[in-house]
C-alpha cells in the first residue's frame, strides 16, 4: 500500500459542488498526497452523488470513505452523509457521534483529526460556504504546523467560510481556485519535520472519535460556562484560547461531544425557542 506523505483536507458548503469540481480539476496526479473532502449535505443525500460528480473532473480515483480503509496516495475520499470523516495515521475512521457546528459530517472534525495525525504534513483548504464551520479546524492545523489555504472570498460564490478563517487567523495562502493545484503540488514536494500536535487538538480529536467522552477531558479544554447544551441539555465549557495566540475563536463544547462556535450556539438556541 502506497502511503501518502501529505493529507489534503477540504471543506465546502453552499456553492461547494461547482467549487469542488474546479478544485479537483486542478489537482496534479503525481502529488504525494491523499485528499479528503467534507461538503455539507442533507442526511438523506445519495452517498455516490458527489463522488460521481467529481470523478468527471479528475483522473484521480474518487470514492466514498469507508470505516477502517487504508489511505492510499492519489485517492480522493469523500465523507458520506450523516457521518463524521476522521483520519488517523494511514487509516480512515467514520464517526457517528454528536454534530459539531450543527453538522455531521463537520469540517472542523476532519481538519482537527488531520492536525492531530499529520501535523506539519496536513494541508487545510476552505472553499465557499455559509457561516463558519472549518475555522477552528483550520486553527488546529495552523497550531500543529500544517499549511492553511483559503479560497479568495472574491472568488467564492458564498464567501462566509473563507472570510471567517481570514478574520480569525493568518493563513498561508488566500488564492483563487485555479491557482490551488500548482500551490498544493509545490507544498507536497517539501519534507517538513514532523512535530506533535498540541494536547488540546489531540483531546478534541479523541472526543470526536469517541475515544474519550467524559467531564475530565472536556474540563482540560476550558472553563464551565453558564450555558446549557441546546442539543442534550448538559453543561457547556467555553474553550480556552491557546497561549500561542493562534486560537482566537469563542466556542463551546459539552462532555457528550456537541460543539458550537459562538455564532452556531446563538442560532441553535434561537431554534429551540
Regions found by a protein language model. Give the residues of each.
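Conserved acid/base catalytic micro-environments in cytosolic active-site loops
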Residues: 1-273
Amino acid at each position: 500500500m502506497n502511503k501518502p506523505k501529505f493529507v489534503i483536507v477540504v471543506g465546502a458548503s453552499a456553492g461547494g459542488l461547482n467549487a469542488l469540481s474546479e478544485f479537483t480539476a486542478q489537482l496534479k496526479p503525481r502529488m504525494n498526497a491523499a485528499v479528503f473532502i467534507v461538503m455539507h449535505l442533507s442526511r438523506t443525500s445519495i452517498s455516490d452523488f458527489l463522488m460521481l460528480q467529481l470523478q468527471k473532473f479528475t483522473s484521480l480515483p474518487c470514492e466514498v470513505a469507508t470505516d477502517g480503509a487504508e489511505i492510499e496516495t492519489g485517492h480522493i475520499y469523500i465523507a458520506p452523509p450523516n457521518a463524521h470523516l476522521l483520519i488517523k495515521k494511514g487509516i480512515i475512521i467514520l464517526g457517528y457521534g454528536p454534530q459539531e457546528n450543527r453538522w455531521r459530517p463537520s469540517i472542523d472534525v476532519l481538519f482537527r483529526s488531520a492536525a492531530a495525525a499529520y501535523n506539519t504534513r496536513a494541508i487545510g483548504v476552505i472553499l465557499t460556504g455559509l457561516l463558519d464551520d472549518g475555522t477552528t479546524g483550520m486553527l488546529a492545523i495552523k497550531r500543529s504546523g500544517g499549511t492553511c489555504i483559503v479560497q479568495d472570498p472574491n472568488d467564492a460564490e458564498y464567501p462566509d467560510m473563507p472570510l471567517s478563517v481570514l478574520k480569525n487567523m493568518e493563513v498561508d495562502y488566500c488564492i483563487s481556485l485555479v491557482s490551488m493545484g500548482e500551490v498544493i503540488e509545490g507544498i507536497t514536494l517539501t519534507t517538513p519535520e514532523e512535530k506533535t500536535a498540541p494536547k488540546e487538538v489531540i483531546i478534541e480529536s479523541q472526543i470526536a472519535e469517541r475515544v474519550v467522552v467524559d467531564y475530565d477531558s472536556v474540563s482540560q479544554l476550558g472553563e464551565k460556562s453558564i450555558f446549557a447544551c441546546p442539543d442534550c441539555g448538559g453543561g457547556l465549557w467555553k474553550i480556552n484560547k491557546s497561549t500561542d495566540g493562534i486560537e482566537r475563536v469563542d466556542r463551546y463544547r459539552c462532555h457528550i461531544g456537541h460543539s458550537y462556535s459562538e455564532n452556531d450556539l446563538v442560532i441553535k438556541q434561537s431554534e429551540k425557542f
